[in-house]
């Protein structure tokens, strides 16, 4: 009886009832008054987007969510480098929600999917080069096109020629 009392929260919900509810349907987390880390982890395992309803996010809960669905990074209140790297590994497009991008994180994203160059805040020639090597069409997002970057893009996909700036197109065609 004493142990049972300890498990009850303000609204009279027992921990076991709450756990069972979120195991059945993660959406029920929105109605759990006294959320524990265990209950929140269960909900996020069931549906990573339940992170939206977690009142007190911990790094463990956030990592669990982004490992399953990188785009849930959008709902992480306090991003850490570890959370961001897990999110980008799961889905390179999660880079769009990274508040403090690092060179390494951007490089990892574009190597996995060159089109994520669109979300790189500070482009470098190396990041752009890696992006177009993965997808020639990433050239459309390159802010500072160099001959080397354009050539790599066209090597990867001849149709990337469409995105070479007109002033550079003639020079590029001469070198082919």
Where in the sequence are the language-model features?
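Alpha-helical scaffold segments
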Residues: 1-176
